[in-house]
Structures are given as structure tokens and as C-alpha cells.
């Protein structure tokens, strides 16, 4: 299969709309004033906000009106999407075609949230029944554990779940369980990912072997960090339980497809939850990897989470480009990245429950689009993936917002708020203060404050320029009604399809991650060198020096 079989161009810069956008940027884009655009067009907000309605009737408003665009720019961006055949690649993904060209795989995480049970095919096989079978297994298992029907080796109920994984097997479940903490039930969940022994050691200090269930999350069951941590957990468990391997069956489950290795580890293969090769790690929270989520919030809430994502999938596949919310988000990202030279993208949730959301999106975006070679196997002559970062606000306002407001870099930003708090304490005082900052930050970034305003407020002399805000800094405001499982599912799927749109325009494969391989290979070599006491001289002078100093101090 040709690596370029889904697109008819090698480089995005070859597309006529790209040249058109470059001319528009030079003639008006770089001097466009959002404040003036609002003055010129009383209906700008009306035209540039889009409301998504979820399967349960809840709504999320996406306000794009504070972005550096006008009707002509939006039209040219839509033209770019058409020329890049974003919809063709999208449809190929939803048909189960092998759009992961470098690994010759389908990209079918969307099939995991196909709760309508439509037939969805990969290589001629309808995968919907298998997806349903795994979900049914997850439902039965999670309900047994949560109800107390599933008991540990001494007959006690499970109270704690420890998920051991890394990358997508960790970031997704961590973020989702934190975001949906309000829906937590009877179990406490803990996550171990880092190979640093501190992570597993500190976790084992706070759990009881009689009442703890370990989930080992590794598709291949060979991931070095995960299996090392899993073996440490198993050794700890056996040391506390009389070294009887038969007890493992009640306290360990595997989220994996490698039945041989799972059985060798000692886990009963009945407690094995599989997923297919067409599920990428950073898209795996919808799969068996989400078992910790189902255990924590209950299966019904987990299903609502899936349905929220499915609703965005339906919107993405069925909505015309002009009103297609994820597509517009992706096009704006390309506009800033490739024409304004923006290198970063800020996501600031005004919601403490979403405090891990930026870290999750960081992997989604940067592992997907941190590429420099196109589907046509040529190096790009344009910038691709942005550096995505963020922290929850209002904390973020007291750390890096200074640079966003008055620094020398353009940082397009997404602000996220839920109108209804799960904790409306003090007669909603906290929520109103939070919301006032959400609205004020976006407004301040847009309108700024000029020299005349600063002087009118009493500033004089050399202090004046320090108090000037240039404004005209773009934001997208995302206002949900409430953070529910369905809302969270929708927000994640929105960003997945934003990332997809970016990658389609840049003509890169957003679904591999070859960049993680070289470091792993070198780490294996160095790992062996750390097992002996001899002085190392096989690397460059810096690496040799660091290794030898480490060995001396270890």
C-alpha cells in the first residue's frame, strides 16, 4: 500500500489555498484587529460561535469569534481543507482503512465508542461484536468488584485499584478518573507509571494486599517500565501473602492481548481484557485500558463517556465543513502555526477536576503531530505540531499568563469552563469568581490596554509602557453546561479530531510514534553498562562522563 494512497499531494505548500492564505496573511491577516472586526460586524459572535448538542441533550458552546479571522480567512481555510481532502481521510478512518501508513494499520479507536452498534469493518471483519464482547466483560467485572461480590484471597472486598501502565495506558485513565472524581463510588484508584522506584514504592505504602486489585496495562505485556513495575507489585504482594501464587488470580488482571505472557505472569486469562492493534496507545482510554475508569465511576457512567465521544464522531462525520466544530478548531491551529509562526498552544481549563486535561492533550497532540515527514515520504518545508501546554486556571493566571498577555510570543489559547459546578459552595461564590476570570481573561487578551488608557489611570513616565497590553491575542472559549461523563467524552473526541484535522492538512501520519524508539534502544544498551562497575568509554564524552559519575555516586 502506498504511503500516500489517501492524499494526492506531497506537501501542503503545494496546495493553491496555502498560497492564497499566505497572500491573505500578508495583506490583512497579520494586521487584522479582532476588536475592530467586532466593531465592523455586530453579528460576529453569532456567526463564529458553534453549539454542540450531546446525545443526552447537554450542550457545549465553542466561541471562535475572538480569533484572528474574518469571513475571507475562514473561507480560505475551508478551501484548504477541501484541497487537502480532509473529509476523504476522515471517511477512510471511519471505514477502517489502513490510514496509519507506516505501520499499515487501521486507526479505529472510533469503533470503540460505536454504541449504536453499527457494523464497522477492518479488513472485511465487522469489529463491533468483539468491541461489545470486551465491554460486556468490563461491565460484569467492574460490577462484581464494585458490589463486593468479587473478593480478595482472604474473603475481604476490594477497596483499592492500582493501575500499572505508561503513556496512553496511564495518561488517559489518570486524567479521566480525576476529571470524573465527582462520580467516584466505593473504590480508590492509584496509578503507577514511572520506572522511578519511588512511584511504585509510595503507592504500595498506602494499600493493603488483602483488598487491592492490580491492573497491568500493556498491550504486548512486554513494555519495560510497566512489566518491571508489575513484577515489583507481584513480589510485594507475594511477600505479604505467604508466597502463594494461587492468590494472584484474585488480585491481578491484565489489559493486554498477549495471552502467553499474561499466563506466565500468573494472571488468570479469564481476567484478561484485550484490544486490537488498531487502537493506538494515546487513543486507548475508550478500550479495555479504561477498565480503571469503569471500576472508579461505574460502568453506566463509563458508557455515557463513550456515548459523548460517539456524538462528536457523528458531528465530525455528518456536519458541513463550515459548521464542523473540530475541523474549524484544527484549521485555526494551522492558521496560527503556519502563517503567524505560533509555536505553542495553551489549553487552560477553568475547572480543577480537569487539572490533568492539558497533560493528556499534550500526548495526544505532540505524539500525533510531532512529525517532519509527510505521507509522501518527503520532509516538510513547513512547521507541524505545536508545543501544547497548560494548567488549570485560575492558578495559571498567577504563573505563566504574564507571558501570554505581555510576552513577545503569540500563544493561541483555549479556555474551558463548565457553567454548573459540582460543588456550588458559598452560594456559588467560588463558581462566579471562577467564571468572571474565564470571561475576563479572554476579553483582556483581545482588547488589551493602550497608552492613553494607562495614562488616564494615572500612570506617568517610564511606568507607562510597562502597563500597556497590546491585546489582539487569540482565544477560543469553550463553555460546557457541566462536566459529566458525556461532556468529558465529547471534549476528548473534539481534540482528537482537531489533531486529526491538523495532521491531514500537513499530510503527516498522526498515528505512529517512531520518535520514541531511538531512546529506548540506547537505554537498553546503557542499562547493561550500569550492571557492571567498569568505566564506560563507548559513547560521546558527555554521555560517558555522566554515566561514570552516576556509577561512582550510585
UniProtKB/Swiss-Prot annotation:
Strongly inhibited by the polyol (sugar alcohol) phosphate D-glucitol 6-phosphate (D-sorbitol 6-phosphate). Also inhibited by the polyol (sugar alcohol) phosphate D-ribitol 5-phosphate. Pfam families: PGI. It is found in: Cytoplasm, Cytosol. Keywords: Acetylation, Cytoplasm, Gluconeogenesis, Glycolysis, Isomerase, Phosphoprotein. The keyword rRNA processing does not apply. It comes from the Eukaryota. Present with 91600 molecules/cell in log phase SD medium. Homodimer. This is Glucose-6-phosphate isomerase. Pathway: Carbohydrate degradation; glycolysis; D-glyceraldehyde 3-phosphate and glycerone phosphate from D-glucose: step 2/4. It catalyses: alpha-D-glucose 6-phosphate = beta-D-fructose 6-phosphate. Gene3D superfamilies: 1.10.1390.10, Glucose-6-phosphate isomerase like protein, domain 1. PROSITE patterns: P_GLUCOSE_ISOMERASE_1 (PS00765), P_GLUCOSE_ISOMERASE_2 (PS00174), P_GLUCOSE_ISOMERASE_3 (PS51463). In the cytoplasm, catalyzes the conversion of glucose-6-phosphate to fructose-6-phosphate, the second step in glycolysis, and the reverse reaction during gluconeogenesis. The gene is PGI1. The keyword Acetylation applies. GO terms for molecular function: carbohydrate derivative binding; glucose-6-phosphate isomerase activity; monosaccharide binding. CDD domains: SIS_PGI_1, SIS_PGI_2. InterPro entries: G6P_Isomerase, G6P_Isomerase_C, Phosphoglucose_isomerase_CS, SIS_dom_sf, SIS_PGI_1, SIS_PGI_2. The modification Phosphothreonine is found at residues 53, 220. D-glucose 6-phosphate binds at residues 168-169, 218-223, 363, 367, 398, 520. The active site is at residues 367, 398, 520.
